[in-house]
């Protein structure tokens, strides 16, 4: 990590009119539900308000704590979100990959704030293993190529502004999952490794001979379940 950048971000003795933006996502890997991209914007002189909240990466917080912080962050910062539905993810995965889908959403949110203020620094949780390449691709999509970009792995742990975006994204996705449960019952977290999610999908597919609309059909988990159904049909026909 660039310690000079980090120290400069957290140095609140010198106020300026600079705008700080944090970007992060939630729901990149699940087989069920949307991917949420969130951005939070704050004036550099107001960063202490976020620091006073004791922010952490959303994964390190309880559900109750995340929800409490969501409200406080929304009061302090300008918050914007993009919710990419499962069917939209499937549609885009036919022509591109998840990194580029995420990158496109990140840049759309960033450009919204750049239009309002060019004196801006953007902190972003890099979704690529190559931070520099990710940073270059992100900057290429911006309407102003001169803005400061800090793209790092685990930025949600290292910078409060990204922690805030992480919490906004996570709570937004969790709320969508809770709405799904009202219709479909227990579906778990939506992640392929979750036994509850696997149980729900397998039961649904076998009973309905297809996937629910809340599932990402382009995911290996979904494809394997559909393959099981097809093989079952063939077996019954041969039998």
Curated annotation (Swiss-Prot):
- The record lists its disulfide bonds as none
Reactions it catalyzes: Endonucleolytic cleavage to 5'-phosphomonoester
Locations listed in the record? Cytoplasm
| Residue sites binding a divalent metal cation per the record | 24-25, 125
Gene3D superfamilies for the chain: Ribonuclease H-like superfamily/Ribonuclease H, Ribonuclease hii. Domain 2
Q: How is the cofactor bound?
A: Manganese or magnesium. Binds 1 divalent metal ion per monomer in the absence of substrate. May bind a second metal ion after substrate binding.
Q: Which UniProt keywords apply?
A: Cytoplasm, Endonuclease, Hydrolase, Manganese, Metal-binding, Nuclease
Swiss-Prot/TrEMBL cofactor(s): Mn(2+); Mg(2+)
Domain (RNase H type-2) spans 18-231
Its GO CC terms?
cytoplasm; ribonuclease H2 complex
A GO molecular-function annotation: RNA binding
| Broad class of enzyme this protein falls into | hydrolase
Q: Which PANTHER family match?
A: RIBONUCLEASE, RIBONUCLEASE H2 SUBUNIT A
Alphabetical list of NCBIfam families matching this protein: ribonuclease HII
HAMAP family with a match to the protein in the record = RNase_HII_A (MF_00052_A)
Q: What is the name attached to this protein's record?
A: Ribonuclease HII
Species source reads: Methanococcus maripaludis (strain C6 / ATCC BAA-1332)
């Amino acid at each position: 990590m660039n310690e000079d950048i980090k120290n400069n971000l957290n140095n609140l003795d010198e106020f300026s009119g600079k705008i700080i933006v944090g970007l992060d996502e939630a729901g990149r890997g699940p087989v069920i539900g949307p991917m949420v991209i969130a951005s939070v914007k704050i004036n550099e002189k107001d960063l202490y308000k976020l620091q006073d909240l004791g922010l952490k990466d959303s994964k390190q917080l309880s559900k109750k704590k995340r929800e409490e912080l969501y409200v406080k962050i929304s009061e302090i910062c300008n918050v914007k979100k993009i919710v990419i539905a499962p069917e939209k993810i499937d549609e885009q995965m036919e022509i591109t990959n998840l990194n580029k889908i995420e990158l496109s959403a990140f840049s759309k949110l960033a450009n919204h704030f750049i239009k309002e203020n060019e004196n801006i620094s953007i902190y972003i949780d890099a979704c690529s293993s190559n931070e520099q390449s990710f940073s270059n691709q992100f900057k290429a999509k911006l309407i102003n190529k001169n803005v400061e970009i800090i793209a790092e792995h685990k930025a949600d742990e290292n910078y409060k502004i990204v922690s805030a975006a992480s919490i906004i994204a996570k709570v937004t996705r969790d709320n969508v999952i809770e709405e799904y449960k009202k219709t479909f019952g227990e579906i778990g977290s939506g992640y392929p490794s979750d036994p509850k999610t696997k149980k729900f999908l397998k039961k649904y597919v076998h009973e309905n001979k297809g996937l629910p609309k809340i599932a990402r059909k382009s995911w290996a988990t979904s494809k394997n379940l559909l393959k099981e159904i097809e093989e079952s049909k063939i077996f019954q026909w041969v039998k």
